[in-house]
Amino acid sequence: MQFLSQKLLSRVIVIMAMSCSTLLFAAEVGESALDLSLPLIVNQAQNAETVSLSDHQGKIIYLDFWASWCPPCLVSMPIMNEMRNRLQSQGLPFEVIAVNVDSDVEDGMDFLLDKPVDFIVLTDPQGETPARYKIKGMPTSFLISAAGVIEMKHEGFKQSDAAMIEKEILRLSELSQ
């Protein structure tokens, strides 16, 4: 009986330790963004096969987790593409990095063939990065300052959200100058 109690206790301790370690690496507002390195699904301007968040250090990043089966995700993509292009043309150090989480990469690619974007789109069909970022639903986005700090977490997307996101990007741009 004592052996079973010790075995059970050791399992509980291991499970608790694993839970705590996951929480230590969760992405929260006010903390440094977790780096990622994922394969490209599409990007005309990139020649690399994988892209890391750290490759864009010094830029404000809109990190967006999306899936082809998510209606709000599909609404956000062209809006964020237009915003990215407009802000970059004004000289803002801003980039959108989207992470597609479809288990079948072809689903994300099909959407992008139909509605191409100019920003970086990565793929994570195993869902490891969304798990590290504690994503609960789609879309979920993070606004990351030029210093690499998560300034905002946003769940869902409505067309009216774009103005609020842009206002926050402009605020971060002013702070980083």
Descriptions of predicted regions:
Residues 92-105, 119-126:
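Thiol-based oxidoreductase modules, predominantly thioredoxin-like and allied folds used
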Residues 59-61, 65-69, 137:
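Short pre-active-site segment immediately N-terminal to redox-active cysteine/selenocysteine motifs
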Residues 3, 18, 22-39, 177:
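N-proximal helix/coil linker or "cap" segments that precede and/or mark the start of modular domains
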Residues 145-177:
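Thiol-/selenol-based redox modules, centered on thioredoxin-like
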Residues 2-13:
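Bacterial N-terminal signal peptides that target proteins for export
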Residues 109-146:
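Short, internal strand/loop/helix patches
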Residues 65-82:
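Conserved redox-active cysteine motifs that mediate thiol-disulfide chemistry
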Residues 37-61:
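A short beta-strand-turn-helix
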